[in-house]
Amino acid sequence: MKLSVLTFVVDALLVCSSIVDAGVTDFPSLPSNEVYVKMNFQKKYGSSFENALDDTKGRTRLMTRDDDYELVELTNQNSFYSVELDIGTPPQKVTVLVDTGSSDLWVTGSDNPYCSTKKKDTTGSSFKQVNKDALASVVESVFTEISYDTTIVTSEATATFDSTASTSQLIDCATYGTFNTSKSSTFNSNNTEFSIAYGDTTFASGTWGHDQLSLNDLNITGLSFAVANETNSTVGVLGIGLPGLESTYSGVSLSSVQKSYTYNNFPMVLKNSGVIKSTAYSLFANDSDSKHGTILFGAVDHGKYAGDLYTIPIINTLQHRGYKDPIQFQVTLQGLGTSKGDKEDNLTTLTTTKIPVLLDSGTTISYMPTELVKMLADQVGATYSSAYGYYIMDCIKEMEEESSIIFDFGGFYLSNWLSDFQLVTDSRSNICILGIAPQSDPTIILGDNFLANTYVVYDLDNMEISMAQANFSDDGEYIEIIESAVPSALKAPGYSSTWSTYESIVSGGNMFSTAANSSISYFASTSHSATSSSSSKGQKTQTSTTALSISKSTSSTSSTGMLSPTSSSSTRKENGGHNLNPPFFARFITAIFHHI
């Protein structure tokens, strides 16, 4: 879902509201020889969306390959992956964010009252100060650099937004583009309402419609989209989540006389038109230092992960609300632990309580229940700052003594360096923020700081997710089409042991011990040797398996093997952390520390 980097409180994942009927048209006309769609995106970080977008040196234009797939270029702004659409006749260019945490496509209308007539002067604040205490006053001058409206939430206030745009709330709409329906000869409005709100207090409302629509030469006309004639977000969204999360189905404001339904969103349109064979896609976000990554619709790239690819079911945490099928990408976390260095006696299990986890590419950092974050913070030496709601700690600089956070998803393990979850406050400071924030919600959100080290395949047809440790070495592509199931993926040992009800999080246990004679191998950073052209499609030869091996030969509570992601200068930052939105974030944190 689309969450601001500066979100202080995330109590609601997504709020959808009233829509009567979005309507569905014929499927698009797509080339019959295409079997998957490939999106290569660039990762950029800047003090604002506009500044990052202006940095276009070396940026590749959208293009179409002549062989068996479509190539679409994306850019990543503050952990948001964006793509440029052509809408209408004649075509108008509009940029939208690609989001796994929502399912609708909407664009900003040219009549949006929040749009300024020219790029916003950053001397004026675009933030509503709910509680003008001393802290808010200190950081106000820093916050003005963000060009979309949001609400700063303090302990004495709750997040709100109103639908009346004031001068201080105006946003720059020119950078990402708007859609003028009156200038398109082919636009058809359904005259039905669209409305959606996000956890960062951005919102959009307007009407549903249809028009000529394409991503470069990839014609996706027939995909329903909404034109937001009122939004406080600088950019629209291309949601690629489950159909149950479409606002026509899960909108909380649907009245009793408004029938809820699902429609064919972007991944479904690709399948039903024949451009891909399954409603599935894989995400390779690449490591935090890289400037590029990949989304494959309808395919998996075996060269982008290390070890085995394990499959687990998507779970339904909203069945009690009447949803018979899952509506968001949630899976079961069966254990959370840490390791210190390369010593096997330094393995620690924080909990084995089953907790729902949302995998969300639209969230920059990660969020966990308050009590679980406290367990983790105590283990890694972080202390809580009540001034702004995050844990702080010393930045990690000695790689040989580095700790890692280990996630048990059901008998297979994914590991991230602790420094991957650290946010550098200032290059001259040794203080880092733990990029796992506490929240009152009993679920977990794993955002970009987790996904950057994980290869994820979202199988919407089978309601499953497959994951493996990401492989950052440049070993070429081993792309295989996804048909009835994800090729080469193994069912996780704990596939059937899923979350069923919310429980209090209990500390302790041993997630590194399972049934007798079972063996799990884990590779945090593994390179693959190139395969010959005559080898089977998707096969790979592993040249290094030194990262991590967890051997389980008994059912006792002791564990054997080493748990340590391999050190690699190509995948690690020497300064002991990853800068989030520099230099803005550095100035924001520096201002806070000067105040407290």
UniProtKB/Swiss-Prot annotation:
It catalyses: Hydrolyzes various precursor proteins with Arg or Lys in P1, and commonly Arg or Lys also in P2. The P3 amino acid is usually non-polar, but otherwise additional basic amino acids are favorable in both non-prime and prime positions. Residues 530-570 have a biased composition (Low complexity). A lipid is attached at N575 (GPI-anchor amidated asparagine). The active site is at D99, D360. It is an enzyme of class 3 (hydrolase). The keyword Ribosomal protein does not apply. GO terms for cellular component: extracellular region; fungal-type cell wall; fungal-type vacuole; plasma membrane; side of membrane. The keyword Signal applies. Glycans are attached at N180, N190, N219, N229, N232, N286, N346, N471, N517. Keywords: Aspartyl protease, Cell membrane, Glycoprotein, GPI-anchor, Hydrolase, Lipoprotein, Membrane, Protease, Signal, Zymogen. Its main location: membrane. Residues 81-468 form the Peptidase A1 domain. Residues 1-22 form the signal peptide. Residues 23-65, 576-596 form a propeptide. Its EC number is 3.4.23.41. GO terms for biological process: fungal-type cell wall organization; proteolysis; signal transduction involved in filamentous growth. GO terms for molecular function: aspartic-type endopeptidase activity. It is a lipid-anchor; GPI-anchor. Cleaves proteins C-terminally to the most C-terminal basic residue. Can process the alpha-mating factor precursor. Required for cell wall integrity. Present with 538 molecules/cell in log phase SD medium. Belongs to the peptidase A1 family. This is Aspartic proteinase MKC7. It comes from Saccharomyces cerevisiae (strain ATCC 204508 / S288c). The lineage of its organism: Eukaryota, Fungi, Dikarya, Ascomycota, Saccharomycotina. The gene is MKC7.
